[in-house]
């Protein structure tokens, strides 16, 4: 069981001006600064972290870069929710292997009409069963979907 009490920093994802590439050194500088404070954890690739703009490889690279600078006691949580269960599971496993200790999974929203309570239950159950780390059900309805959980 993970401890979700305390302060978690919802990290923004910095980009290199003019290129659109993720600026890993800038992100590491931010993480070093935050880790010097009494925080419980950091959230990467959430709503504040521009998750919808990041591909899977970029999310994994963020985790590797974060683990290089964060102390082990700082809980690293990463957004892995994608539009398919298979893709969400694949990314969840990849970020866990890279050092994430928990994941945030928002509901698939593209096919809203197909997202019945049973479909959502099956999606989250499949992700949780396949995940090597705890799964946190996540939703930012004004930004990420119009589904009611």
Question: What positions do the PLM features span?
Answer:
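Active-site beta->alpha loop and helix N-cap motifs at the rims of alpha/beta catalytic domains
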Residues: 2-147
């Amino acid at each position: 069981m993970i401890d979700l009490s305390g302060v978690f920093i919802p990290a923004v994802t910095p980009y290199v001006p003019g290129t659109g590439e993720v600026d890993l050194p800038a992100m590491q500088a931010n993480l070093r600064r935050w880790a010097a404070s009494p925080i419980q954890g950091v959230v990467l690739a959430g709503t504040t972290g521009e998750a919808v703009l990041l591909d899977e490889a970029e999310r994994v690279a963020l985790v590797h870069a974060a683990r290089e600078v964060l102390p082990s006691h700082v809980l690293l949580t990463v957004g892995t929710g994608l539009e398919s269960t298979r893709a969400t599971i694949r990314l969840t496993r990849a970020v866990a292997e890279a050092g994430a200790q928990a994941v945030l999974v928002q509901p698939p929203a593209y096919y809203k009409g197909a997202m019945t309570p049973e479909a959502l239950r099956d999606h989250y159950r499949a992700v949780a069963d396949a995940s090597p780390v705890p799964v946190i059900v996540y939703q930012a309805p004004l930004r990420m979907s119009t589904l009611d959980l």
